[in-house]
Amino acid sequence: SNIEYRLKDEKHYQEIVSKLKELKYSNLYYYNIPQVDYVDPKTGEVKPKDLQVEHWHHINENNAGMVSAIGFYMMLALQESGIQEPIAVVDCFKGGTSASVWIKETDLARDTDLKHAFLDKYHETIAGKSWEDFDRETKAYNLTVEKHNRDLAKYLKMHPDTSLSTAKNIVGHTPWPPPYRPDLYTRPSGLNETMLKQIEFGVFNQMVWYQGENDTDRAKYYDKLLPLLIHTWRQTLHDPSLPVKLIQLPGYANY
């Protein structure tokens, strides 16, 4: 969700828009990979159904809001370093995801610990369930989230000077993760199959990986997950020497 944070929601967005109107920050481009959760192997039906057909965007005051804020400021830093050629970012992100969803299933399966922690756990959870069971679990989860959102909104209305983080510490954080189901993007290797595949023939000069807190409950596996993720992406992009920059949170707590 940190990479997914859009420029339109960032503190300095209006300032950026004003400068774009003055034709500053030219030669910057972005492409947002459609966030495909699932492709039915039998019918080819894509979930969600309302995805837009994407294209390259030459950044201007009208479309800058939808680029990743981190992606934009990375491009800006490169441009201000003296690069005069066009600079482009391909936004391939989905908030609330484990590193395991971006790694090939065959790669996860090769490591006994990762196979047990991610693949086996997933398959054990969904075993023997029907689509009606999955829908029932999802409905119950959604009702829990809706109640949480109502409680949070009520608290913030009663305490308008309270920050969102403080309010969440009192009311509780958004219930997460949702229950596993075969068409949910949080399943192991899910977004490797539906999003990373969309750029497998692209040519890139560097990759930036930002991991939030989603793997904190399985932190002991991260020394295996991270190298495997880098291996998977380099292999998929046919570039064994692709530079990878790691932008990590220094720590996480319910402050």
Residue ranges and their predicted role:
Residues S1-Y255:
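Cell-envelope and extracellular/periplasmic
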